[in-house]
Each structure stands twice: as structure tokens, then as C-alpha cells.
């Protein structure tokens, strides 16, 4: 490793719990929610989710997710199937999760693509839209001096602000699994865990052991 201090960032952590609750009609549980997310990048697990009063939201999430998958086709069917099979929700989108495991995209079982509403051309479609959006933003930036900016939920600027101002901020970061941050994943693997940021830098938090089925899924990608 180089002497440069680095941390891996992804926005799937901060865009996990709130959209999940809204998809399931649980908008009233968003304010004050508490969560624990850990695993590996693009395969982090929502291990615990509670409302502002400390009530476990998973029993209701599991019930509603099963009902929604049985009742209609929607954009998150793969991850809701994860909830049914593994008991937990995954941070990364359903279209990507279908690519990260051997269960859904099978040449011998093409009917699974339709059953789980998997968009095989999602990434090229997203790239086309991004390029169009960038061109639009360039035109707006070059022709207007009065544009306003709304800060996104991406971590980078908030990390810099917190270190400079000696504040405290929590992120989900990707770091080497030193000190058994996740006990049942390899010590030299890169894991995604909660991290506290302050004036002294970034401090990964120990999670302990993942449920065995979740660790096994992570290992298919670590391997």
C-alpha cells in the first residue's frame, strides 16, 4: 500500500433506508430513523433499522416487501427477494444485484428476467441520460451567472468540512478489514462499515459478525 490515506466512498449507503421505507408506504417512519449498514461495497446489508422510538422496523418491512413482490412488478424485486431469502435488504440496486450473484440472470432460465423485472440494458440507458444531463448542465453553467446549488448527500465535501472544522460526522466507508471490523470476513478484504469523521480523521467502527448467509454472499465477491 502507498502512504497516502484513502477511503472508498459509495452513495448506496445513504440512499438505502429512506427510499426503502417510502417504497413500502412507511414514509412516517423516516424522520429520526436509526440504521446499521455493513458488508462490502455494492453489497452492504441493512442489518438493523429502527424508528425514532427504537422500534424494530424489519418485521413490517419483511411483510410489506413480500406482499409487494407477490402483487405487482416493480423496480426493486431482486432486493425484495433478498429480504425473503436472506432476511435482510441490500444497499445496491436490484439491477446490479442481479449481476452480482448467480441466481437471476441465467441463460437456461430466461423467464427469470421477466419474473423479477430485471432491466438488462439499464447501465447503457443510464449512461446516455448522464451524458445528456452533463451537456445540459454545461450549457446552464456557461450561460447563467445566477444558478443556485443544492448540496447533495455525497460524502466527500462533508468529510472535508468535518475534518477542517473539527466537527463529528458519520459515514459509510470502505476500508481494509484491520482489527476484525467484520469478524467473519477476511482481514485483508475491503469492507464497508460505519465510520466516524472528526478533526483527527476517519475512524472505522467495529461491527462484529455478519449473519452467516450475508457473510457467505459477500465472500462470493471477495473471492
Model region roles, listed by residue range:
Residues 3-5, 12-223:
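Long, compositionally biased stretches enriched for glycine and/or charged residues
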Amino acid at each position: 500500500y502507498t502512504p497516502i490515506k484513502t477511503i472508498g466512498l459509495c452513495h448506496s449507503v445513504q440512499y438505502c433506508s429512506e427510499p426503502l421505507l417510502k417504497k413500502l408506504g412507511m414514509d412516517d417512519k423516516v424522520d429520526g430513523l436509526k440504521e446499521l449498514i455493513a458488508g462490502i461495497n455494492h453489497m452492504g446489508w441493512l442489518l438493523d433499522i429502527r424508528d425514532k422510538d427504537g422500534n424494530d422496523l424489519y418485521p413490517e418491512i419483511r411483510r410489506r416487501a413480500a406482499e409487494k413482490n407477490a402483487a405487482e412488478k416493480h423496480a426493486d424485486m431482486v432486493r425484495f427477494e433478498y429480504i425473503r431469502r436472506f432476511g435482510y435488504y441490500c444497499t445496491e440496486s436490484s439491477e446490479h444485484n442481479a449481476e452480482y450473484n448467480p441466481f437471476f440472470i441465467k441463460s437456461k432460465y430466461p423467464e427469470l428476467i421477466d419474473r423479477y423485472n430485471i432491466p438488462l440494458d439499464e447501465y447503457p440507458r443510464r449512461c446516455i441520460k448522464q451524458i445528456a444531463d452533463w451537456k445540459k448542465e454545461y450549457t446552464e453553467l456557461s450561460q447563467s451567472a445566477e444558478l443556485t446549488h443544492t448540496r447533495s448527500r455525497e460524502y466527500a465535501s462533508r468529510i472535508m468540512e468535518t475534518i477542517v472544522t473539527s466537527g463529528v460526522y458519520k459515514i459509510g466507508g470502505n476500508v481494509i478489514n484491520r482489527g476484525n471490523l467484520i469478524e467473519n470476513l477476511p482481514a485483508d478484504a475491503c469492507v464497508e462499515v460505519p465510520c466516524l469523521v472528526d478533526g483527527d480523521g476517519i475512524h472505522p467502527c467495529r461491527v462484529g459478525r455478519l449473519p452467516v448467509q450475508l457473510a457467505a454472499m459477500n465472500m462470493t465477491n471477495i473471492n
